[in-house]
């Protein structure tokens, strides 16, 4: 080691790496599941096992602290080759809202993760509002986030004043943590994952990406082939 003899032995057995006989099974690198509810939803139909939504926060809602490393879904997913995952909250009432986190699925109580690494949203059909309204609301939220600077988020008191003076922030009843996340979106180039399918919606998202210089990821995109040249 480093040009020096580290160990002498009379034994002819050479110490090497551990050999595991997989008995002809296929071996692959660990897979990453990029869109899951692993660790935050156990049984979808049982509300007491769901930690994926909030009635208070919108943009700044984080599921990270609710992650359950003992989830029964973890060993099942690991047996199918998934060793890490990005868990996402259910979309809030806002077209942009909710923070997703990356987790290593090792079932250890000392959770190995990257907290609040992505912001999520949606653009498309909604039972209560039109696409045009959702798109306008999304753009208003982005404009508000882009207008923020470091002094604006210096304290919760300052943030409360910013919210009070903003029609869109007041209308959405944003909280301090919501505003801080919107600041992060632009200051830290936080990835923004928007779920959308229609070709026209995808084009609108591309326009928003260019206008606001977003680190945009379009999820779903069933009609992406129709606008492949623009993508």
How should these model regions be labeled?
Residues 61-65, 170, 216-218:
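Short, flexible loop segments at the rims of nucleotide/cofactor-binding pockets, characterized by
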Residues 1-28:
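Histidine-rich, glycine-flanked metal-binding segment
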Residues 203, 222-231:
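Catalytic core of soluble alpha/beta enzymes
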Residues 30-31, 112-114, 226-229:
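Short, charged, surface-exposed secondary-structure boundary motifs
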Residues 25-88:
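Metal-associated gating/positioning segment near the N- to mid-region
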Residues 36-37, 90, 197, 221-224:
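Short, ordered loop/turn segments at secondary-structure junctions
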């Amino acid at each position: 080691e480093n040009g020096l003899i580290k160990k002498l032995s009379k034994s002819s057995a050479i110490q090497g790496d551990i050999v595991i006989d997989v008995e002809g099974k296929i071996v692959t690198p660990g897979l990453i599941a990029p869109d899951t509810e692993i660790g935050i939803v156990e049984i979808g139909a049982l509300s007491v096992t769901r930690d994926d939504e909030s009635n208070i926060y919108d943009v700044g809602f984080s599921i990270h602290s609710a992650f359950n490393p003992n989830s029964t879904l973890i060993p099942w997913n690991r047996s199918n080759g998934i060793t890490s995952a990005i868990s996402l909250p259910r979309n809030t009432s806002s077209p942009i809202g909710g923070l997703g986190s990356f987790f290593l699925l090792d079932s250890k109580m000392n959770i190995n993760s990257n907290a609040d690494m992505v912001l999520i949203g949606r653009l498309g059909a909604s039972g209560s509002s039109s696409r045009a309204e959702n798109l306008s609301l999304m753009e208003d939220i982005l404009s508000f986030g882009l207008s923020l600077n470091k002094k604006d988020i210096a304290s919760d008191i300052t943030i409360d004043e910013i919210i009070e003076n903003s029609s869109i922030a007041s209308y959405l009843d944003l909280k301090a943590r919501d505003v801080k996340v919107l600041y992060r979106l632009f200051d830290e180039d936080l990835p923004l994952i928007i779920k959308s399918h229609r070709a026209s919606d995808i084009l609108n998202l591309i326009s928003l990406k260019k206008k606001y210089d977003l680190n945009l990821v379009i999820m779903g995109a069933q009609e992406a082939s129709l606008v492949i040249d623009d993508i």
